Amino acid sequence: MKAGATSMWASCCGLLNEVMGTGAVRGQQSGFAGGTGPFRFTPNSDFSAYPPASAEGPNIVCKACGLSFSVFRKKHVCCDCKKDFCSVCSVLQENLRRCSTCHLLQETAFQRPQLMRLKVKDLRQYLILRNIPIDTCREKEDLVDLVLCHHRLGSEDDLDTSSLNSSRSQTSSFFTHSFFSNYTAPSATASSFQGELMGGDRTLGSGALAQEPSEIASANTEDDEDDDDDDDDDDDDDEENLEDRTPGLTKKRVRASLSDLSSLEDVEGMSVRQLKEILARNFVNYSGCCEKWELVEKVNRLYKENEENQKSYGERLQLQDEEDDSLCRICMDAVIDCVLLECGHMVTCTKCGKRMSECPICRQYVVRAVHVFKS
């Protein structure tokens, strides 16, 4: 009974599957999956049901603070370094936008004493914004020299562009004047021809009218020549100023020494390079020093030891002079303890005095050498 019920249930399930078409659907699904059915489907790697993600553009940020630009942080381009900065990190001066770093160095007028007072961070940032390598710079003075060199090169480029513009203005003025001269000549001839036909009065009037444009053209050429001469003089002055500045860089810098210090207060005002030069000159090792105050302590100790050595050396010289004054002038070994009679000079010891026949100072005959005792 139980087996018959099971077979009936299985046949009912098979009939239901045939009616609903589950087998055909399964066959089609297997055909799609395996690629062997009536509809062969080959997946394409280039096709996607979703649209491609839009490529995000480069995120432009401020070079100083690193924040992206927005409505409240508008983008501005520095007129010196040509980099992008926000309104907070840039300064508006004389209708020109400069970043804070360029503005800071512009305030120093690129003078060496003023640049030495700036921070190393600002000098490095100024050079990095201009894509100038600073790998070889070890001291602050190297950065200052590099900034001054780059500034002078930029001024030379400005001079070249100004001279190019002046030459272009000269050529344009030349072509303009030649055009006007060629243009006024036919009018002058026509007016003179009409004057001959109309009479003598018309001839004089037309001649005056013909002379006026030529006088104006000649006056313009003279003014342009004067302007060109002034530009040439300015260029010569700028070149002389550059020549005066360049020998200062070519001069050999004098190394710092311990004799340059007059007191311990002068040590604080010296740069790191000068401190290292003093230590190296006096054979002091500073390889473990990472901060400036460590170098200052070493130089202070060196200065104190040098002062003590000079004092002790002076005392030793004084004692040596005193000892030399009390030694016998003949043997330079024993102490002077003898007086020579009759002259009374004390220049020898008793042993040498008894051997002397005459005084070595006054050449008087020695009668007797008397031994004396110092109290």
From Swiss-Prot:
One of its GO terms (biological process) is protein ubiquitination. The keyword Nucleus applies. The keyword Transferase applies. GO terms for molecular function: phosphatidylinositol phosphate binding; ubiquitin protein ligase activity; zinc ion binding. A zinc finger (RING-type) spans 328-363. The record marks 227-228 as: Cleavage. Pathway: Protein modification; protein ubiquitination. It is found in: Cell membrane; Endomembrane system; Nucleus; Nucleus speckle. Residues 202-250 are annotated as: Disordered. The modification Phosphoserine is found at residues 169, 257, 259. It is a peripheral membrane protein. Its EC number is 2.3.2.27. One of its GO terms (cellular component) is plasma membrane. PROSITE patterns: ZF_RING_2. Keywords: Apoptosis, Cell membrane, Cytoplasm, Membrane, Metal-binding, Nucleus, Phosphoprotein, Repeat, Transferase, Ubl conjugation, Ubl conjugation pathway, Zinc, Zinc-finger. It catalyses: S-ubiquitinyl-[E2 ubiquitin-conjugating enzyme]-L-cysteine + [acceptor protein]-L-lysine = [E2 ubiquitin-conjugating enzyme]-L-cysteine + N(6)-ubiquitinyl-[acceptor protein]-L-lysine. Autoubiquitinated (in vitro). Proteolytically cleaved by caspases upon induction of apoptosis by TNF. A zinc finger (FYVE-type) spans 56-107. Residues 221-242 have a biased composition (Acidic residues). Pfam families: FYVE_CARP1-2, RNF34L-like_3rd, SAP_RNF34_RFFL, zf-C3HC4_3. Residues 115-134, 267-281 form the SAP domain. Interacts with CASP8 and CASP10. Interacts with p53/TP53; involved in p53/TP53 ubiquitination. Interacts (via RING-type zinc finger) with MDM2; the interaction stabilizes MDM2. Interacts (via RING-type zinc finger) with PPARGC1A. Interacts with NOD1. E3 ubiquitin-protein ligase that regulates several biological processes through the ubiquitin-mediated proteasomal degradation of various target proteins. Ubiquitinates the caspases CASP8 and CASP10, promoting their proteasomal degradation, to negatively regulate cell death downstream of death domain receptors in the extrinsic pathway of apoptosis. May mediate 'Lys-48'-linked polyubiquitination of RIPK1 and its subsequent proteasomal degradation thereby indirectly regulating the tumor necrosis factor-mediated signaling pathway. The RING-type zinc finger is required for the ubiquitination of target proteins. This is E3 ubiquitin-protein ligase RNF34. The lineage of its organism: Eukaryota, Metazoa, Chordata, Craniata, Vertebrata.
